[in-house]
Every structure is written in C-alpha cells, then in structure tokens.
Amino acid sequence: MIQAYEIAHLIKINDLEKARNIFKKTVENTYKDEFERKSIFKALEIAEQLHYGQYRESGEPYIIHPIMVSLFLAKFQLDFKATIAGLLHDVLEDTNVEKEEIVKEFDEEILSLIDGVTKIHDLHNKTRSIKEANTISKMFFAMTHDIRIIIIKLADKLHNMTTLSYLPKNRQDRIAKDCLSTYVPIAERLGISSLKTYLEDLSFKHLYPKDYKEIKNFLSETKIEREKKLYKGKLSIEKELQKSGIEAEITVRSKHFYSIFRKMQTRTNKLTQIFDTLGIRIICKKQKECYEILEIVHRVWKPIPGRLKDYIASPKENKYQSLHTTVRIPEDNQLIEIQIRTEEMDRIANYGVAAHWIYKEQIELKADDLSFINRIKKWQQESANKSQYSMNDIHKELLNTFIYVYTPEGEVVELPFGSNSIDFAYIIHTDIGDQALYAKINGKISSITKPLKNEQIVEIFTSKDSKPDVIWLNSVRTKKARSKIRSWLNKNDNTIFVDNNIIAYLVGANKEQRKLFSLFKSYTKTKIKRIAIDPECSPTTGEDIIGIIHKDEIIVHNENCQKLKSYKKPQLIEVEWEATPTRKVHHIILLLKELKGIFSYLENIFTLNDVRLISEKIEDCGNGHGITNIIVSSNAKNITKIISALKENPNILQIMQIEEDIKNYDN
C-alpha cells in the first residue's frame, strides 16, 4: 500500500522511461494473477499507441499522465480493471478510439469506468455556476454507481495538479480553487486522507505561494529541534508498551502545510506561535490495546481536559476510527495531539473506500456501505425534478467541511461547517429543536444561533413556551433543521406570511433571493426601555457580547461572564457593537390590515427620519390584507427609528426587513 512519502516522491516524476519502469515494477508486485498483469500491460501498449505524438503543456509526452494516474491506482491496490481504466481514461475524449473497440479488447465493465471518468469534465473547462453544478452532479451520479470512478478521477486530479505551474496564473488559480472547494471535500468524505492531504497542499502552493514557502522553510529549519522535544516522551511510551507486552509502532509526523496555514488564519497570523506542528501516531494490533495505550500516554504526559475524542466508539461518517488525545509536553509547555488506532483503522484512515480492496480479493465495495454515498443518493432523489443544480445547494448539502461536536454524554455529532445549536438540536430530536431556548457551549451560556466550532460540548435547554422563529432559517445549515422549521411555521404562527408566499420568496431556490434573505433581520415586539452594560463584567468594544432581556431592559454581558449562570430562564438576544454608520438599502416588507392612508403615513415618517425612498410597491392580498414592499436608503440608526415607529402602528400586522449594499442602486 502506498505511503505518504511515496506520494511525495511519485508526484515529482516527469521522465517517461522512469515512470514506465516504476509502473511495470509496481504492477508485477501488486497483481499476482498472470491474466491481470498481461491485461494491464496490454492496456499500456494501447494507451502509448493512442497518445503517440501528444504532449502536455509542460512539454512532457502525454502518455506520462495516464501512466502516473494508473501508478497511483496500482499503489492503492485497486483491482486490475480500475488500473486499466486509469491508463485509458482519456482515450475516448482525446483520441479517435471507439467504445466498441474498448469492449472488444477488454470488456463492458472497463468501458463503463472509462466512460464514467470521461463524463466528469474538469470544472475549469466549463462556465461557472449552473454548468459547474451540473458537472459535479454527474460526478456524484457516477460515484453512486461505481466508487472506482471517483477514485480514478481523484488520481487524475492529483497528477494534473503537479503540472499546474505550466499554465497561465489565472488558470492556475481557478483550477486550484476548484480542487480545494470540490475534490478535496470529496476525498475527505470518502476518507482518502492521503489524497486529500496532497490535493490540499498542491492547491495551497498555487493559491498562496508566499505562505506556502514560509511554512515549508519554517518546518524544514525547525524539524530537528521540534522532534527532539518529543523524543524523551516517545522513549518513555515505548518502554511502558514493552512492559505491558503491547506491540505498537510509534511515529512522529509533521502536520501538512495547509492545515498549519488554516490554524494561522483562525488562531494567530504568526507562524512561530503555532506550536502543534507535530503529532504522534501509535499503531497497534487490537482494538482493546488502543485504550490501554491511551492510559499509558496519560501517565507519561498530562492530558488536556476536554480534548479526548473517541472515534472508535463513535466513528466518523467516512468510517474513520481512532482515539485522539491532546497532551502537554512539560519541557516547553507545548501541546501535542496523539492518535491511537489499529492497523486496520490506519488503512481506512489513510485510504478510505480504497482500503476495501486491500487484502479482500474479489470483494466488491457497495456504494451503500458509505453514508456519504447514501446522502448523495437521497439528495439526487429529492432533486429528481430539477433540470439544473445550484453550486450553493451542492456545497451546502454535500461538500462543506464538517465539524464534530459532542453531547454532554460524549456522543459525537457531525454537522456541516457553520452549523449552530439549532442544527444540533434538530439532529438530536425534532421536539428539542422546536422548543430550543438557549444552549450551553462547554458549560457557558450561548445564543442558539451562534455558529459552533470543532470539539465543543453542546447542551440544549428547552421550554414549552419556546417555538421556532422564521429568523432561524437565516442561520441554520442542515437540511433537516430548515425542513422542520418550515414545517412548524406552516402549521403555526406565520400562516399569513406562508399563505402569501413571502417565506417562499425569502428562502426560495433563486440565488438572488437567497442573497437577500441572508441579510434578513427580525425585530422583537418586546418594548425595551433601557439598554445597559453589566457593571461587573463590563465588556469593552470588540469583545464577544450577549444580551439578556430582563423585564423591560437589555443587559449586555461579556459572553464569558459567570453572572449569566444565575439566570434560570434567560431570554438571550444576539447583540453586537454598532459599526460606523453607513447608508444601506433596506427592503421593508409590511403586512397591513388595510391599504387606506398608507402612502401618506410612510412618506411622513421617512421625511422625519432622513430616509430616502427609492421605490414602493403595494399589493392587495385579496383577503382583506395588503402587502407593501418598500425600498429605502439610510443608515442603521435611522432605520431602527423607523422600525420602532412602524411597530406602534396598529394597521401593521408584521414587519420584515432585508438589507442590501447601496452600490447596487446608485447610478
């Protein structure tokens, strides 16, 4: 099976003779059946004939590319038919060969693999948006029928990324972005971390060349010094393992470049302040030994509370299993992540679905074995009537990076990046979502709409008086949460708005509507007489803050204020520091009892509050009510005054507001 250092070596090969020799040697070592070897070498001859005289942008003979793609597949120990398809994956598109000839030389199964890869055109050869989304939907369709197709495509993408520097800079950036946003998440969802890691780093290299070089040089210059700090502890663990009679392999690994870059973006911009650039991995034979090793590790190094993750008891969606713990190295107070798993778990961690072919002759991997594939199938069924797909929907439902949070009982919950406590609540149970009042994140009170982060412990507090709010639709990320909230709104409070299709307008599939809805704000009907800063925690400008509605006032606290715990049933409200006043365009949608006199009333309050009216549209609902959609321009302070005035008008039943950039309306 291919190791990480081998991938690093192989992606640098650009000599045809060297590529051919390594490929032949790998085939001889991997495929023991004579018929399989002869079939692969026959495909190599055919590929060399068909691609003769063709060259890549780098000036290399084109045949190097399919040889390298198939070399990756052979190193992954995929079946011989997949390796043949890798050699011939471009012949239908780039040569004059007919499909019938492939069937005659090989069989229908190999043709199906080649045809499947051919249909997945690279995204940079397409126009953006809808065509791009349809291309990805084809990829997903192929994936659900035969997972080998996407593994071949990932190998194809890996080698193409190695020759990206020969393309114009704008094409490099576009292809690298597509790789990072589409192919990397797919590799991650399929659990093929060895491919995911190199696709990430190659994309990073082209998108952020200065940062890439800085990190590479830093790791190279400090490698020996960093590894020395772990050596003493590593020896102590090895000694304890020998005493316990446990056979295990301990390796010190360096975090890959892009993961370090992400930490720099979220924690600190200074590379010298990123301490956990190294990790330790311990591979053992049996599952029960993982927990014994964990106990030994915690004897040698002090564990960090709350940083133990048991993915053995609760595997990730892509079948990943491992124990993760973070410990503190006493020599320099450095934090180190340690992963503990069995050999089988390690194969699945590195090679994901491809691991199913290792040591399992003639055993077919079924698409149903992976929940990610099942999710794709379900998405395709639900979208069966769509002739076109939205990239926003695809990324939101299928490709987003996931986060992993915990219930108070320690159960792992996987959520799309950007999810909040409402998403979490609906995953646990619909009733918990419908009645969610507030959350505790790592023991601290938090708003249920605040985005969650990896490894947080989430506890939901409910109330029978609490109910879903239409504003929740603006912040949730999971389809289940959106569906359940809409279902509740349809049955309960917002019937007038739902009946008049306003909710559908605001949360519809149209891209521009979604863009507007992302800026939708709601206002409480509670009359607030006073807003005050809590004198004890005394938050300052720029700090994370939260508001507590107490009687007729809002008390603003620092999010870490211990005083928050004293409220039995706090009514949380999201608050933020006021930005410098700027003029924005605001769509104000009003549901009216009657239309009479509304024009003069609105004109009067706009004039009094320095608000410029851009347009006004009024419609009769046909049920005694009216709807007006007003577009105005002003700063946030004046708009707030207007909203307050509108709430006092008994003719106005409900108010919705959407904010947009003024530049879209200025001539």
Swiss-Prot record:
Domain TGS: start-end pairs: 401-462
GO molecular function terms attached to this record: guanosine-3',5'-bis(diphosphate) 3'-diphosphatase activity
Needed cofactors: Mn(2+)
Keyword field contains Nucleotide-binding: no
Keywords: Hydrolase, Manganese
GO cellular component entries: plasma membrane
Domain HD, residue spans: 62-161
Pathway(s) the chain acts in: Purine metabolism; ppGpp biosynthesis; ppGpp from GDP: step 1/1
CDD domains tied to this protein: HDc, NT_Rel-Spo_like, TGS_RSH
EC number in record: 3.1.7.2
Catalytically driven reaction(s): guanosine 3',5'-bis(diphosphate) + H2O = GDP + diphosphate + H(+)
Gene Ontology BP terms: guanosine tetraphosphate biosynthetic process
Family matches, as PANTHER family: GTP PYROPHOSPHOKINASE, GUANOSINE-3',5'-BIS DIPHOSPHATE 3'-PYROPHOSPHOHYDROLASE
Family, as annotated: Belongs to the RelA/SpoT family.
Function: In eubacteria ppGpp (guanosine 3'-diphosphate 5'-diphosphate) is a mediator of the stringent response that coordinates a variety of cellular activities in response to changes in nutritional abundance. This enzyme catalyzes the degradation of ppGpp into GDP. It may also be capable of catalyzing the synthesis of ppGpp.
NCBIfam families for the chain: spoT_relA
Descriptive protein name: Guanosine-3',5'-bis(diphosphate) 3'-pyrophosphohydrolase
Species assigned in the record: Borreliella burgdorferi (strain ATCC 35210 / DSM 4680 / CIP 102532 / B31)
